[in-house]
Every structure is written in structure tokens, then in C-alpha cells.
Amino acid sequence: MCTNIVYEWLRALQLPQYAESFVDNGYDDLEVCKQIGDPDLDAIGVLAPAHRRRILEAVHRLREQDAAAAGLYFTLEPQPVPPAPLVEAVPPGRRGEPCGSSAQGTRGDPRGQPGAPCSRELVSYPKLKLKIMIRDKLVRDGIHLSKPPYSRKVPMAGILEYLMNWPKSSQNH
């Protein structure tokens, strides 16, 4: 029997009898299973209408989860230049607040402003703005990347001693 994520998914749907057929037809990953439709279920051999309905509903839920998670990713691309100059003063607020929170929106991000619609679409940040946002978040959370456990200092004396003995150690090999 196949023991993978698709088997576990089908077992959760109480349809583990189709696991082998899924894998045999190339549906061995949930990413691939998100593309399943009626013709695919015919090829897999899912003939019972109740089973087909359960699988198609689960596929729909997988797609919804994937769409909801899409807002969590970002890319480092320059923002397109607006066609007309938009000058709008947005007071600096706390970054990283979820949509609909009581805090004011982030600078230049109209999604975080009060009254703005809460959307989960992909947002691109300029590289410099993203660096500033990350730096501010680290400072706010009290994280110092130059201190343990995030970094480990190598003693300089050890490096100098190694370099001074380097010609000797290379002759031994």
C-alpha cells in the first residue's frame, strides 16, 4: 500500500480504497490533486456519485486553502510607476498589522488603511522597503542577529594561530 500524503488525504476523506489508483494515475502529491476534475475521477475509477462529490469538495477546499495562502508570499520586484502622480499623506503606523486592525496602515500600502477592503492578493515590495520592514520588525521583536543564537563569533586568536601554523600543517599532508 502507498504511504504518502495522498493516502493520508484519502484516508481522512474515508476513501483509502482509491489511493493505489490515484498514485497509478500520477496523483501522488496534493499539488497535483488540486487539478482533479470529473474526467480524472473517471480515469482513476471513482464511480460512486457520493465518493466523487466528497473528492471534488475536498479538491475545492485544497484550492481555497492555496488561494488563501497566496497572500503570504511576496516578491522582490520594483513597483510599477503609477500613470498619474498620486500624492496621499499616510501617517506612519505599525507595520505587520493584519487587515481590519485598529492600527493605522503601513506607509504606502493602502490595504492596511482603515476602511480599505481586506484582500489576499500578491503584493510586491521594493527591495529597500522590504529591508526596512524586516529591520523594523526585528527591532520591535528585540531580535539581534549579531548575537547568539543567530550568530556565533569565531575567536580571532584561533584564526591567527591557524594561519601562523598553516605552512607547517600543509607540509604534513
Curated annotation (Swiss-Prot):
Region (Disordered): 89-120
Tissue-level expression: Detected in kidney glomeruli, and in peribiliary gland (PBG) cells at the hepatic hilum (at protein level). Detected in liver, kidney and small intestine.
Expression induction: Strongly induced in EPCAM-positive liver cells in response to liver damage caused by long-term 3,5-diethoxycarbonyl-1,4-dihydro-collidine (DDC) feeding.
Keyword Cytoplasm appears in the UniProt entry: yes
Name of the featured protein: Sterile alpha motif domain-containing protein 5
Subcellular location, record wording: Cytoplasm
Name of the encoding gene: Samd5
Domain SAM span(s) in chain numbering: 1-65
Subunit record text: Interacts promiscuously (via SAM domain) with EPHA5, EPHA6, EPHA7, EPHA8, EPHB1, EPHB2, EPHB3 and EPHB4 (via SAM domain) (in vitro).
UniProtKB keywords: Cytoplasm
PANTHER family, per the entry: SAM-DOMAIN, SH3 AND NUCLEAR LOCALIZATION SIGNALS PROTEIN RELATED (PTHR12301), STERILE ALPHA MOTIF DOMAIN-CONTAINING PROTEIN 5 (PTHR12301:SF8)
